[in-house]
Amino acid sequence: MNFGKKVWLIGNSSEKSKKTLNKLSKILKAEHFVFDDINPEIVISVGGDGTLLRAMHMYEYQLDRVRFLGVHTGHLGFYTDFTDEDLFEVVEALYDENPAQAIHYPLIRVQVSFTDGYQIVRHVLNEATIRRASKTMVGDVRISDYLFERFRGDGLSISTPTGSTAYNKSIGGAVVHPRVKAMQVAEIASLNNVVYRTLGSPMIVAEKDTITVCPAPEDDYSLTFDQLTFEYKNIKSIEFSLDGTTISFANCAHTPFWERVSKSFIGEVE
């Protein structure tokens, strides 16, 4: 009999994911796992990477005591180690799973400060972006205390090493191994001519540095925290840092990072 490990399942709306979640739930109940959505030990994501990101943000304020495990039911599951055909293997892995052997990935802390003194703090697993709704974004970019540049363009993306394979990669950023404790700044359609200049290439920023963006006072900024999008105005500054917060993945059938990258983007090498 299971020793009472507490789990919770989160799925997406596809029929395949619903069926997989239902089947896995029945297996786990038969094996006497405890279902707890308030204080789970392991959150099982059934779907794709978007589902895993949603699960992470649902438990964003419990990351110090929650581990995640992904079952993917689609075409691309960078954060998922199992498929919908591996459900009995999932149960076996949960029996054998040891919290001390969890895999940890760094998160970026994002602090948004407003002109009235109000602040919000979020953490992201993939990336955070800032852009304007329809016009050119203008903002000063500081690396720690140094004014690095005045950016003009569609926006900026700041990503984690694991997030470097997501939106960051699609806008020309580099792929960075999670062992490299750093943040990456990638420009979104920067404006470069004889009048206005930006660096024009991605930047890898060291662990101890902070990145601060001070946007011009406009009222139509769009900020994303992974897959979550918010509209803000009166933003004074946005500070990005690595504060030591991590997400923990159950080390059940963990696939090495470069193997994940190869399988996700290259496929079979002949």
Curated annotation (Swiss-Prot):
The catalytic residues are D49
Per UniProt, NAD(+) binds at 49-50, 54, 126-127, 152, 154, 165-170, 189, 227
Reactions catalysed, as given in the entry: NAD(+) + ATP = ADP + NADP(+) + H(+)
Q: Which GO terms describe its biological process?
A: NAD metabolic process; NADP biosynthetic process
Sorted alphabetically, the keyword list is: ATP-binding, Cytoplasm, Kinase, NAD, NADP, Nucleotide-binding, Transferase
Q: Does the keyword Ribonucleoprotein apply?
A: no
Q: Which cofactor does it need?
A: a divalent metal cation
Question: Broadest EC class?
Answer: transferase
Q: May I have one GO cellular component term?
A: cytoplasm
Look up keyword Nuclease and say if it applies.
no
Judging by the UniProt lineage, the source's domain of life is Bacteria
* Membership in a protein family: Belongs to the NAD kinase family.
Any idea what this protein is called?
Answer: NAD kinase
Q: From what organism does this protein derive?
A: Lactococcus lactis subsp. lactis (strain IL1403)
